[in-house]
UniProtKB/Swiss-Prot annotation:
Expressed at higher levels in LPR compared to susceptible flies. It is an enzyme of class 1 (oxidoreductase). GO terms for cellular component: endoplasmic reticulum membrane. The gene is CYP6D3. This is Cytochrome P450 6d3. Changing I363L: In allele CYP6D3v1. Induction: By phenobarbital in susceptible CS (16-fold) and in the LPR (1.6-fold) strains. InterPro entries: Cyt_P450 (IPR001128), Cyt_P450_CS (IPR017972), Cyt_P450_E_grp-I (IPR002401), Cyt_P450_sf (IPR036396), Insect_CytP450_Detox (IPR050476). GO terms for molecular function: heme binding; iron ion binding; monooxygenase activity; oxidoreductase activity, acting on paired donors, with incorporation or reduction of molecular oxygen. Pfam families: p450. Its EC number is 1.14.-.-.
Length: 520
């Protein structure tokens, strides 16, 4: 009798699961065949492919405009059409204004950042933070970025002091560069990870990106933040927390309190956030922007330390990996494309000469803005290797797909594979070729609707211009002072990681040597 009940129960579960995982077929939608209980993510669970590449594989597998997929238990939709994707992100933003990822403002304030927040909470914070990344603010912070760029230059000079060509893991080196910029500009710390790689901030950074050192629960939470928020919320309620996040919170708290008590002013993003905390707004671009900010009573603060810390951590995660990746992938591609390398290097030389800057001297904000071909290179890199290989949204009100009978129902998650769109020959001829000129006005050769490396619409990356600036500074320093040795073409491969970014297998190794005028 017991055996009969067990068989009946298992059969009922199987029938229910089968029905659940055929939801899209029953609605007449082309869909991926689900693997119970992983849905479309069996390869993610088996650590064979990261989430972004699984979405890319599904993009390549089908031809339809909208494809049904399953994020573990949750039915979702993969958008394969550039115009529809852009419509979701822009003109019909009101139907897709949330990301549908884990956030718990009340019980987990460190989750309440600009990326995850929903509805009015997101709108209010976005409006407050937007002035932080204006041209005037970036110009004010530029000197700090250039300082880190000079430390990068000094480190490379030491590595190449014998005058020979050395093959270096440029991804690892530029990760150090990016982390030091974040530590300095976002967290207000005076650090130099090139000479002191064991400093606390660098150690914490390494831990946050080291997939192997994470516990199983930490990896699970990192994945479920995106694909199954209720499980992420449950794990948090059960006490699963990321130690690195809370240690960085302590660093932010300590720095803010020290600055408020001692009226310390530094031209960085943290100063602007302290200004927002004490006055309720960030000043316009003017001469008084970087003046000291009088502290207000704790109960009158417009922004809590937790909110500053959570958004600082967001800028750190988003900024460090994307800057390191875009810069290192650009160098990697230039090494395989000598014509583009020559154009980029010649432009840097000419711009520095025009602005009266020595190759190893201080670069100015204006000189970086003049490097237009370098802009094309960065655009092409972020096309081929988008910092975030997918975008996700949640339908917040029923939405009828144009020229279709299909309606996306409220609460349905949608995924846009940026890697898929950006490598689709329909939108970008010869998608695996590195062709910066495709973005030049006079030789434009792409469908603009499909290009969205920083997202589009009201929720596009708020720090986009800062990321491009940081990338161009590093590229200009390297191109002005070093030869990038040509190498045979080899497409980068990506390893499994629970973080939603593209992580190259074994880094990116490129040969560098000092340019003749730079020999010591």
């Amino acid at each position: 009798m017991l055996l009969f009940l067990l068989i009946t129960l298992l059969s009922a579960i199987f029938i229910f699961a089968k029905r659940h995982y055929t939801q899209w077929q029953r609605l007449g939608l082309v869909s991926d065949e689900a693997v119970i209980p992983f849905g479309s993510l069996a390869k993610v669970f088996r650590k064979e492919r990261p989430f972004g590449l699984v979405m890319y594989d599904l993009y390549e597998k089908f031809q339809e405009q909208v494809v049904g997929i399953y994020l573990f238990f949750k039915p979702a939709l993969l958008i394969r059409d550039a115009e529809l994707a852009r419509q979701i992100l822009t003109s019909d933003f009101n139907s897709f204004h949330d990301r549908g990822i884990y956030v718990d403002e009340k019980n987990d304030p460190m989750s309440a950042n600009l990326f995850a927040l929903e509805g009015q909470s997101w709108r209010t914070l976005r409006m407050k933070l937007t002035p932080s990344f204006s041209s005037g603010k970036l110009k004010g912070m530029f000197e700090t970025v250039d300082d880190v760029g000079n430390k990068l230059l000094e480190y490379l000079n030491n590595q190449l002091k014998d005058g020979q060509t050395h093959v270096l893991d440029i991804k690892s080196i530029l990760t150090t560069y990016a982390i030091d910029i974040i530590g300095s500009v976002i967290f207000g710390l005076e650090i130099d990870s090139f000479t002191n790689p064991d400093n606390e901030f660098r150690v914490l950074s390494d831990r946050s990106f080291d997939n192997e050192s994470r516990s199983f629960l930490s990896k699970l939470q990192n994945l479920t933040n995106f694909v199954c928020p209720p499980i992420a919320k449950l794990l948090t309620r059960l006490g699963t927390k990321e130690p690195v996040v809370y240690r960085l919170r302590d660093i932010v708290k300590r720095t803010i309190e020290f600055r408020e008590e001692n009226n310390v002013v530094r031209k960085d993003l943290l100063h602007l956030l302290i200004q927002l905390r004490n006055t309720g707004k960030i000043s316009d671009d003017n001469d008084n922007l970087w003046n000291k900010v009088e502290s207000t009573a704790t109960n009158l603060k417009a922004m809590s330390i937790d909110m500053i810390a959570s958004n600082s951590f967001l800028f750190y995660i988003a900024g460090s990996e994307t800057t390191a990746s875009s810069t290192s992938f650009t160098i990697y591609e230039l090494a395989m494309n000598p014509e583009a390398l020559k154009k980029a290097q010649n432009e840097v030389d000419e711009c520095l000469k025009k602005h009266g800057i020595k190759p190893d001297g201080r670069i100015t904000y204006e000189a970086i803005q003049d490097m237009k071909y370098l802009d094309l290179c960065v655009k092409e890199t972020t096309r081929k290797y988008p910092g975030l290989p997918f975008l996700n949204r949640q339908c917040t009100q029923d939405f009828k797909v144009p020229n279709s009978k299909f309606t996306i129902k409220k609460d349905t998650n949608v995924i846009i594979s940026l890697l898929g769109l950006h490598r689709d020959a329909k939108y970008f001829p010869e998608p695996l070729a590195y062709k910066p000129e495709r973005f030049a006005d006079e030789t434009k050769d792409y469908d603009a609707a499909a290009y969205m490396p920083f997202g589009e619409g009201p929720r596009h990356c708020i720090a986009q211009r800062m990321g491009v600036m940081n990338t161009k500074v590093a590229l200009a320093k390297i191109l002005a002072n070093f030869n990038i040795e040509p190498m045979p073409h080899k497409e980068a491969e990506f390893q499994f990681n629970t973080a939603p970014v593209l992580v190259p297998v074994n880094g990116l190794r490129v040969g560098l040597s000092k340019r003749s005028f730079n020999r010591r």
